């Protein structure tokens, strides 16, 4: 229930920190939490964050008022965290739950996708092993090629063909 007042803030300037974000949103109501998501290794902002309001109506007001506005020189996107935004950004979530590699590969666009895709197919077919392993390997090679050739949301197609290998 506490997530109802939580907003996803995308498109942040990499210099924007929690204090800047709080200043931009505090005029819409009492804020219980502000988080700018940072890269685990470099500790730099990843360009998005979350603002949680104590009151759901305040969060909705802030979302309507701030979506598309400029913060620290960058136009931001404001969406409700979880429900509606989760469905729209399902590609990221689906990829990360399918295997952490797909999430990172998806961000790489192209080479990264194929690298992660092929290793997942190879590991899987190797697990079923035996003499059919070589046939599965070539099958995944074809699938990987078509996966790499199609761009944009094609990982779902790969999952469909992936299911037929099992």
Curated annotation (Swiss-Prot):
Organism superkingdom: Eukaryota
Pfam families: RRM_1
Biological function: Cold-inducible mRNA binding protein. Acts cooperatively with elavl1/elrA to stabilize AU-rich sequence (ARE)-containing mRNAs by binding to them and inhibiting their deadenylation. Essential for embryonic gastrulation and neural development, acting to maintain the expression of a set of adhesion molecules and cell movement during embryogenesis. Plays a role in the specification and migration of pronephros cells during embryonic kidney development.
Keyword Transmembrane applies: no
Post-translational modification: Methylated on arginine residues within RGG motifs. Methylation by prmt1 promotes cytoplasmic accumulation.
Location within or outside the cell: Nucleus, Nucleoplasm; Cytoplasm
Gene encoding the protein: cirbp-a
PANTHER family linked: TRANSFORMER-2 SEX-DETERMINING PROTEIN-RELATED
UniProt source species: Xenopus laevis
Limits of the RRM domain: 5-83
Name under which the protein is recorded: Cold-inducible RNA-binding protein A
Entry keyword set: Cytoplasm, Developmental protein, Nucleus, RNA-binding, Stress response
Domain notes: The glycine-rich domain, which contains a number of RGG motifs, is necessary to regulate nucleocytoplasmic localization.
Up-regulation conditions: By cold stress in adult brain. Cold-induction may be adult-specific since cold-induction is not observed during embryonic development. Induced by tcf7l1/tcf-3.
Ranges of biased composition (kind: Gly residues): 92-115
Tissue expression remark: Initially localizes to the animal half of the late blastula embryo, then to the neural crest and neural tube from late neurula stage through to larval stages, and finally in the neural tissues and developing pronephros of tailbud stages. Expressed in a range of adult tissues including kidney, brain, lung, liver, heart, muslce, stomach, small and large intestine, and skin.
Disulfide bonds: none
């Amino acid at each position: 229930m506490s997530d109802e007042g939580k907003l996803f803030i995308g498109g942040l300037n990499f210099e924007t920190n929690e204090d800047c974000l709080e200043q931009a949103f505090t005029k819409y109501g009492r804020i219980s939490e502000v988080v700018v998501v940072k890269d685990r290794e470099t500790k730099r902002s990843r360009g998005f964050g979350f603002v949680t309001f104590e009151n759901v109506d305040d969060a909705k007001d802030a979302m309507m008022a701030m979506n598309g506005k400029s913060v620290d020189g960058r136009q931001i996107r404001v969406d409700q965290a979880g429900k509606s935004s989760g469905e729209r950004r399902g590609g990221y979530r689906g990829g990360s739950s399918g295997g952490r590699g797909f999430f990172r590969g998806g961000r790489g666009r192209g080479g990264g996708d194929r690298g992660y895709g092929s290793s997942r197919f190879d590991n899987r077919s190797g697990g079923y092993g035996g003499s059919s392993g070589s046939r599965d390997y070539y099958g995944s090679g074809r699938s990987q090629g078509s996966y790499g050739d199609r761009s944009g949301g094609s990982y779902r197609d790969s999952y469909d063909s992936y299911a037929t290998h099992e």
